[in-house]
Amino acid sequence: MELKGSEILVQCLREQGVDTVFGYPGGCILNVYDALYKHSDEITHILTSHEQGASHAADGYARATGKVGVCMATSGPGATNLVTGIATAYMDSVPIIAITCNVAVSLLGRDSFQEIDIAGVTMPITKHNFIVKDVNKLADTVRRAFKIAKEGRPGPVLIDITKDVTANKAEYERKEPEQVKRITDRIKAEDIETAVKMIEASKKPYVFVGGGAIASGADAQLNEFVHKIDSPVADTLMGKGAFNGTDPLYTGMLGMHGTKASNYGVSQCDLLVVVGARFSDRVYGNAKKFAANAKILQFDVDPAEINKNIKTDASVIGDVKVILEKLNEKLPQMNHNEWITEVKSYEEAHPMTYHKGVLTGPYIIEKIYEATHGDAIISTEVGQHQMWAAQYYKYKAPRQLLTSGGLGTMGYGLGAAIGAKMARKDKLVFNIAGDGCFRMNMNEIATATRYNIPVIEVVVNNHVLGMVRQWQDLFYGQRYSQTVLNDRVDFAKVAEGLGAKGYTVSTCEEFDNAVKEAIELNIPVVIDAQIDKDDKVFPMVAPGAPISECFGEEDVAEKFGR
């Protein structure tokens, strides 16, 4: 049948199983919005307060489900407002489709109103992007974009469609979405055999898990693998939940704000098995001294990650779920009780601790964990609160923690929470923010109230830019340049002005009551939780130092002379 391009686009979204789109209309994309209006029973459109919020919401939807998230915006500033969200998704390998509409073909290259080369702008931050100037190519382009976004290492894809394409007609025939194939052709039998021999020879193995294990859906295979080789487990920020955080073999996050146990264990192990982790500089500290006693065995779907930052001794390239399945078939049951006892003894001697009896970041996270029975979806912004959320909430399953790990995007979390809640209405969704981050995109509270999306925003409010100030305190002679927020914005009143319920709390009891009420209300809520400006995130590794030199608050006086 013959349809307009805008109708073809919407039909292709339906083909791919898209049920929710986040966006903001404008001149060049009007035809698409007209088509969406006609199909509002099949595809829900969430009008965000800003296009950046739409891109983060699509990201949160994707991370919470493993499906492709979709956002859209008009040409010019609408398109450029998506850029930060696209870059966030790119750095964390999140499958989103960003749909933009540009000026008509006849107006391209003429500095037309709201014309921008958004494909050129986003080329370095997309897995692929397309410019569609022919309506006859639109349907296949959309189908290909979804396949690219999902296949192999996931990532964002941009489709820029000229306005005349959305108005022109072409033949459309519905097609079933192409099944995404797991990348297995690079998994070599000899590489599997090498991995088996290295694991069997190890006396002190350590498993290090990243976001690739979640993207692959490898949590069950990972659990079997870990217990079969009887190894302690550390993870990255992006790998939280791939391995159950309540399992006795789990020792916590690795790296700059990782646990002392994980940083110690990886520094002492003789084999580091890396499952879908990309070796961010925040993980390894001093590259020359990282896991100095160990051979490194890396599993990853992307060959570009092998030897990129840390030299490996052996690797297996391919889908990590399939790799682990093959290894589980070949490996015997192993016993490393003596090694595990050593690591656990160190963990018991260096536990995660914080000041009790006063409202602090760690207390806030532990209370949310308790109130949600460890079953909520937690999104975060970026900073101290992000690290506390990683350290003190025990993630039992994949896709529970949504956070900007690679780009470190302040303003990410609220949009992501909205996207996650739209995707997982059965889950409680909390966004953990700092007061600096909340200012970035707090207008999205209006989105939550417009659609009654019951996300709970917890602002860990220390009236400073906490993480930057922590560095200034420890490494910049306590010169607090532009990190003190003296304006004292009343976030509870801001919330109420945007239609949400607002709380201001400063004690543990007040916070406990606010969280309990927020869960019971089942409406958008903002809790302004006021803590001391000098609270810091520990443990910590100084910039450029090896992770074995991880220090806690108890070490500050000796290390810094105060």
Regions inferred by a protein language model and the residue ranges of each:
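N-terminal alpha/beta PP-like core and its mobile active-site loop of ThDP/TPP-dependent enzymes
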Residues: 1-331, 367, 371-374, 454-457, ...
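Active-site diphosphate/adenylate-binding microenvironment
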Residues: 6-10, 14-19, 32-37, 344-420
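Generic hydrophobic/aromatic pocket-lining and core-packing "Φ" positions
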Residues: 10, 86, 142, 416-417, ...
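Active-site nucleophile and cofactor-binding loops and adjacent substrate-binding regions
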Residues: 24-26, 45-56, 71-78, 133-134, ...
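Thiamine diphosphate
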Residues: 114, 450-543
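Phosphate/pyrophosphate-binding active-site segments
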Residues: 136, 174, 197, 293-384, ...
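Hydrophobic, well-ordered secondary-structure elements that form the walls
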Residues: 296, 368, 380, 419, ...
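Catalytic phosphate/nucleotide-handling subdomain of diverse soluble enzymes
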Residues: 412, 416-454, 460
